[in-house]
């Protein structure tokens, strides 16, 4: 299938070639600093959902389809999404580029490595871990950090169960007690959340410097800035902070940038990407993780309160018949079967999410994501 060159996609938003860093023919990073003076004038549409099921309800697919629909109506529309993590891509969840005709492309490249942002977050996170242990080693028992209090683990962008709990420091030359630690997935890193909340490199460095890594022997907190890790970590993230521009199958511009999980962080793409999209397009569709009680709630409570992104002008609450049946008590294996009583019972869940959105006073619609078996 032929896609538009990313230069053509950028031109749709008024982004000049000099402010693009090309990653092949269909991907590019945008120098967001060149557009910092443009205020976000567009209307933001947030896509959320009822309580998710193991099958997923299709928020990403709905968001992509809505942005394409706005483009077909002649509106200047843009899409903002999170980057896929390799862990879920190779796990039961799969990729995060939509499906069918509602898809962002180039699909394989977005799902696998993309522009290297997640690897940069991995490097920055693990640099801090290495500097923590280095400080403990060279300071000795009387140093700044009490090795028994270190809270900072390591990360990698993969589901590797064997590394969730490990013991480090068993080398006889390591000047500290061996301790139990582990590896988290990169998308769950505090660095990922920080990258997606930062407004620029200066703000990024300040936020990275505030990361708590452990305590002194007398209980005082020790931060990343105390071991001089903030500058080096920011240097590793200097390219990752720029949003990634791609497109949907129908050629609608899409910024895919950052990937914090909603259960342990705020669960939406970077503030920089959303703000840039709102300054260049009339309508911006974004997606928040999980349901209205988690991703949407955090969008209002965290993202909007930064002052960098306005509150949504409208919301879409995604539902499915299989989710209604699931929350009506039907087992996963029996979801394909017709069960009107279970659908009716499942409306209690949907009704609660409707109440959640009403609290925020934002106009919304309920979207029924239809499947062939419905």
Describe the residue ranges of each PLM region:
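Flexible phosphate-sensing "switch/lid" loops adjacent to ATP/NTP-binding sites
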Residues: 1-374
């Amino acid at each position: 299938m032929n896609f538009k060159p990313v230069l053509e996609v950028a031109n749709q938003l008024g982004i000049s070639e000099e402010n693009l860093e090309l990653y092949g023919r269909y991907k590019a990073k945008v120098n967001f600093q060149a557009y910092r003076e443009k205020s976000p004038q567009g209307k933001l549409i947030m896509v959320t959902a009822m309580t998710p099921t193991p099958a997923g309800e299709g928020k990403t697919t709905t968001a992509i389809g809505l942005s394409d629909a706005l483009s077909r109506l002649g509106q200047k529309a843009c899409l903002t999404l999170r980057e896929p993590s390799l862990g879920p891509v190779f796990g039961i969840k799969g990729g995060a580029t939509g499906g069918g005709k509602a898809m962002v492309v180039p699909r394989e490249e977005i799902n696998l490595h993309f522009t290297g942002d997640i690897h940069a977050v991995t490097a920055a996170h693990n640099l801090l871990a290495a500097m923590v242990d280095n400080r403990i080693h060279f300071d000795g028992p009387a140093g700044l950090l009490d090795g028994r209090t270190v809270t900072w683990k390591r990360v990698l962008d993969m589901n590797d169960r064997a590394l969730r709990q490990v013991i480090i420091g068993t080398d006889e030359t390591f000047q500290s007690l061996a301790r139990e630690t582990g590896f988290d997935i990169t998308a769950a890193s505090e660095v990922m959340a920080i990258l997606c909340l930062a407004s620029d490199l200066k703000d990024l460095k300040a936020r990275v410097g505030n990361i708590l890594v452990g305590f002194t022997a007398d209980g005082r907190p020790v931060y990343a800035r105390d071991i001089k890790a903030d500058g080096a970590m920011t240097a590793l993230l200097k390219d990752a902070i720029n949003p990634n521009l791609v497109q949907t199958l129908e050629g609608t511009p899409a910024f895919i940038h950052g990937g914090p999980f909603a259960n342990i962080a705020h669960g939406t793409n970077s503030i920089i990407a959303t703000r840039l999209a709102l300054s260049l397009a009339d309508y911006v569709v974004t997606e928040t993780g999980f349901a209205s009680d988690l991703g949407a709630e955090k969008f209002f409570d965290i993202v909007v309160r930064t002052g960098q992104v306005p509150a949504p002008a409208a919301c879409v609450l995604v539902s499915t018949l299989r989710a209604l049946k699931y929350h009506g008590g039907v087992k996963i294996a029996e979801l394909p079967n017709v069960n009107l009583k279970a659908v009716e019972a499942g409306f209690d869940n949907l009704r609660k999410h409707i109440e959640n959105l009403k609290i925020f006073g934002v106009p919304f619609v309920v979207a029924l994501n239809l499947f062939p078996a419905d």
